[in-house]
């Protein structure tokens, strides 16, 4: 995978607005994220540390490197099969929220927006989205928080209300 990553980075450098987007969490060193699953947390945070390193490494070439992470569980097969079946799926948002947030990040100026750890709904709120009910598996239902979201992550009222 190292060779493949290197080739992809080289292709990015030639693009007019090059981006690398990792799906990795913000680096929050709270002990609660390590308790009971240290190896898993280390693996996730390793991807996040790559964002920091590559953002600095490629900044002078105009290649943006950012991370995107969901605030809540996302209704995927992994969530369905490993985290609690239909009950957790009802407490999740649809994958479209991550796709829409990724689009917003990938269309930003790569020379201006790099080295950021983004939360899906914050990205969309900043882009003007005010109604998040379309992303909920059950509109106005309770949502299950995802792992690794720092306690101090902003939560605008429009996001709370939908």
Features from the language model and the residues they span:
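Residue(s) in the substrate-gating loop at a strand-loop-helix junction
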Residues: 25-26
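Short beta-loop-alpha junction of Rossmann-like oxidoreductase domains
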Residues: 31-33, 63, 69-83
